[in-house]
Amino acid sequence: MRIIGGQRRGLKLAEVGDGDARAHLRPTSDRVREAIFNLLLNGGYGNPVAGGHVLDLFAGTGALGLEALSRGAQRASFVENGTAALALLRRNIALMRAEAATAVERRDATQAPPAPATPVTLCFLDPPYGKGLGERALAAHAGWLAPGALVLWEENIAPVPPEGFTQLDQRRYGDTLVTILEAP
């Protein structure tokens, strides 16, 4: 795994192989991550990354949020509950020297504390496939999102977004279905 673009382009991130089934890690491949950022930056959404406040739910290794920081996001918050994933996430933040621009929360992504003072403008949602956790996490964090914020959701089947969210695009990359939503 590596950072695909931006200021830290080419930076090698901590290795996890093809994923750790026991730790429920399924990192977004470089190819899919590149496609996601091409879609975000060239899909008619302006540039939702530059200057943005990013929330990476079910963050795993943090590759999506860190990619956003490399491409100009101002801040990234990561939510992860797994011990192995948290260790990799913290290591990757250190490799990027991004400690000052990040916050890491160890908690269940389906439960949200009160919203931060600065609303999130871009949310990455990459839950374990087929468990309905994405729907619950997005509903729990809806109050964190700025009006019109983009949500990029990875699943293996079409997700059911909470009421008020508008689906803008959906693309399949192998087993991964990427859905872009707009917050109300």
What do the predicted segments below correspond to?
Residues 1-184:
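Class I S-adenosyl-L-methionine-dependent methyltransferase catalytic core
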